[in-house]
Amino acid sequence: MAGCNDIHAADRRYALQIMKRVFGYAASVDTTGLKAQESYAYLKYDIRANKRNCLLLAIPTMYAIANTGVREHVGETYDRVIMKRPGDMRLTQMLERNTIPYGMRTMPTVLKYLTPLIYDELLIDGRIISPFHVRNRRFYRYKVSPFMRGAVIVSFRPRLKNTKLVRGWARIEESTGRILETSFDGEYDLVRFHVTMTTGDEGVKTLMPAQCNLNARFLFLGNDITAEYTTVFDLPKRLPDSTRIVNRRDTALLNIVRPIPTNSHEQYLYSRYYAARDAAQADTTKHSHKRKTWTKILWKNVGRRLLMRTRQKFGTHEQGNFRISPVLNPLSFSYSGRRGLTYKFDVRGSYFFNERQGLQLRFKTGYSFKQKQIYFDFPFTFYINQRRNAYIRTEWSSGRHIYNSEMMDAIRLERKDSIDWSRLNLTNFRDHSFKAVAHYDPSSHWGLEVGIVSHKRTAIDDHSFNFLGRKDSYNSVAPIAELTYRPLGYNGPILTIDYERGIRGMLGSDTDYERLEIDGQYKHHLSALSYLQLRAGTGFYTHKGFGSYFLDYSNFRENNIPGGWNDDWACSFELLNSGWYNASKYYVRANAAYETPLLLLSWLPIAGRLIEKERIYVNALTVKQLNPYIEYGYGFSTRALSLGMFVAQRNWHFDGMGLRVNVELFRHW
């Protein structure tokens, strides 16, 4: 264990041996033949608003406690837990009660801290680097101290201050390296947390928490919210099968299953809440109260929709759900030097009839303030058989700007008269498209997709075309086919071959062409913390009929509704002028992105502690007149924003530099 050079103990060899046992304990637990296990869990919590102001209304999941006169709320839940394997726990809520207005969930992001995976690389929901995994020993310093017969104390602290690292201690079983109890502190996503947990007694249960306590504190621009959570796992079944839960807020049933009695202060808060609720219901006949009630309803249904993400399940078995992004939220905006400020709005929904069949839809729209253009993308998918990835999908898109100089060149050859061409805009068009495909995977290695796609391209400046007596819109309709090959199955690289054939006269098409594209993508996880993402591809036109002016590709196009850090930053061109996407009969591209924490800026003394992830980008492209075009970039993500800095070369000469900024504040809330 040469990586443990900084372990401080009286007997260095003994300390190294203890840490070797800790790092290897999870692998020593026999999980072969493990079947899904059912148990139950109980959670109780207390949330207090010590200080608050109007800004709390705009923070996701904080609307309920910001818009009430009560400063302290309590609650409890009783859940069914299905564990298929260590770390894979599915919780289904059976009973709950709380004093939060409207029954809304508050600070659900901190619930992840109640199920730490202490032996995994990532301790909490992919956020915190675990000190108990062998690959992470380079991030921590350890000290082993004797405690009592058969047990030792291991203290750990980070080598540098960073939001993804924690400090604390663990009580370790000396002979096996099993963690009996641990406590750690940290700060992530504006939440300071202190976690104390004990593990199970035997077998696979020793890898999971038996009881976990969390103290959390949220500080943001004058708001101070503290919360205490206690969770007890692996509870036996206490409700008979004949018990049918009609009301999830049934206090009598909660009294049966509750392993921790409520204290006098919690009882007081519940009694106060029920008394206020009953008094409000008794006064609903008063006119003055009706006006006040309608005001509350307006704030509840309109105000929270504007400021909070809306999620809702529906159906007899909650087989349907939808999610609507908040209308007014920092996450709705992004900025890049080329695109300017962009506003985004997203609606998603799904409904599943059974395990194989279902419906999914998404409406994604955006507005570019620089281009003064609305974009939207509306895919709708009907899954026929999810196990075979068999589906029918339609997609309607509009607003994308494309550049085409071939038409202007053709018009200039036809018109020999003296015209001030610089005053005419004959190169910029707006693309409206509709696509319908059927997809089927005969195996995990192969996939086949066939369908049809249509485009209507209209001139942004129709007056210029009217002045020259030319039409200002052009249509194309093309059958399409795509063959997918996955050499290693669904978790490996993906190779695709796309074929598109535009037919003049088909459904009003006035364009004929033939195009082929080949694309390969692979995201290789070097560890749970780091990955290398690669993409390479080419596309070319094998035929272009007379009057077929437009060049457009499926795998090489500008994304007009950019997402955040985890959406589309890797393997995309950030500084490339939009005109180059449609300016060549061929393209060859290659993209690479490497992401890891604690790479460069994370080591800075003060600002480095805020950096969560870092990336290095290299993007290369060859098209007509660009041989080559290369972008070099570096990016990082923090709790508040993600930022990418890029430098471009065109034909080996400097071609500019730029920034891309996305708001990340409260993205995980």
Question: What do the PLM-derived regions correspond to, one by one?
Answer:
Residues Y391-M408, S418-L426, Y490, T496-L600:
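C-terminal outer-membrane beta-barrel translocator/porin domains of Gram-negative envelope proteins
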